[in-house]
């Protein structure tokens, strides 16, 4: 007699939730992130991010280094937009000191800050679409990424983790011919953005994977603390370059792009549209560049130039004190928020009057943005979780610190 395999009419099927580990060794996590995912069949019911696999202890380390030494630690937090972290750090220390940054140094900071944003978004476009199974855009985006890193190398000597900014200004001036190379790169980027748009912006497979997936409405985005492109993709046009200008951003003409959709497609499009705004800002910066000093003239903050060391004993003393001990900001605390490729970055620095910070607290956007993952993923299919994680765009060094 054949066994009856079909349930009786009206009988309920008993199902159990399945718990699945994604990472910490998984290419779609873009680092060592572990996700514990509960699923009912193919649908996600809960996502719990497990962080800490890349914990570096930078905050504590920075409390045992001089203020100037810490410039080399800050950029290693977000290794895709390193300039954002070193800029946020030096701005907070300069606020403590009351330092005066020369105009040329501020313009160079803006140019490199926006080049760093372009670099980060290029990695987002290439790796994000790779997560969805599209291999070709990866090579297109990394073509421009390598050209961008060539510019960093020419200025700093490093392609990543640059450490070029200094409290009070810059480490050194721009090399000869660098601005012409930047202009050539911007022309290349404009052609590249057109190619990226042609490749996937109207691709029906990409649209099916991204449109309406992982929707985060504006009120939820604000409650979750989202900032940057992820917040603007939910219809909230907040940007620290406009709302809390720094480095003279109030003198630059650019638009804050936003979208009311709040889905994965909107988060992708934010980065594409921000390419053009960054290009616009950099071109204005190139026009603003004028010859001039690149450091605060206060010798108690900035190292004296080498030619002064040959003729001035006072310069030698300042140099010795800065190298061996560093400067001493007055008692106080400072926090300057800036706009990185992922959102608001800020370094809360407390001074006790010594040559090392009493406390450094890093406000990193990736850590906060990752808290929105479960909200965006509940109810979607597992394949969509990878899409949503890619569009949130966390950097694990930015998360764990």
From Swiss-Prot:
Enzyme Commission no? 7.1.1.-
What SUPFAM superfamilies does the record point to? Answer: HydB/Nqo4-like
List, in alphabetical order, the Gene Ontology terms for molecular function in this entry.
Answer: NAD binding; NADH:ubiquinone reductase (non-electrogenic) activity; quinone binding
Q: What is its main location?
A: membrane
Q: Which reaction does it catalyse?
A: a quinone + NADH + 5 H(+)(in) = a quinol + NAD(+) + 4 H(+)(out)
Q: How does it sit in the membrane?
A: Peripheral membrane protein
Report the enzyme's class at the first EC level: translocase
Which InterPro entries does the record associate with it? NADH_Q_OxRdtase_suD, NADH_UbQ_OxRdtase_49kDa_CS, NDH1_su_D/H, NiFe-Hase_large
Q: Which UniProt keywords apply?
A: Cell membrane, Membrane, NAD, Quinone, Translocase, Transport
* Gene3D superfamilies documented for this protein: Cytochrome-c3 Hydrogenase, chain B (1.10.645.10)
GO cellular component labels: plasma membrane
Q: Where in the cell is it found?
A: Cell membrane
Q: What does this protein do?
A: NDH-1 shuttles electrons from NADH, via FMN and iron-sulfur (Fe-S) centers, to quinones in the respiratory chain. The immediate electron acceptor for the enzyme in this species is believed to be a menaquinone. Couples the redox reaction to proton translocation (for every two electrons transferred, four hydrogen ions are translocated across the cytoplasmic membrane), and thus conserves the redox energy in a proton gradient.
**Of which family is this protein a member?**
Belongs to the complex I 49 kDa subunit family.
Assembly and partners are described as:
NDH-1 is composed of 15 different subunits. Subunits NuoB, C, D, E, F, and G constitute the peripheral sector of the complex.
UniProt protein name: NADH-quinone oxidoreductase subunit D
Q: Which organism is it from?
A: Deinococcus radiodurans (strain ATCC 13939 / DSM 20539 / JCM 16871 / CCUG 27074 / LMG 4051 / NBRC 15346 / NCIMB 9279 / VKM B-1422 / R1)
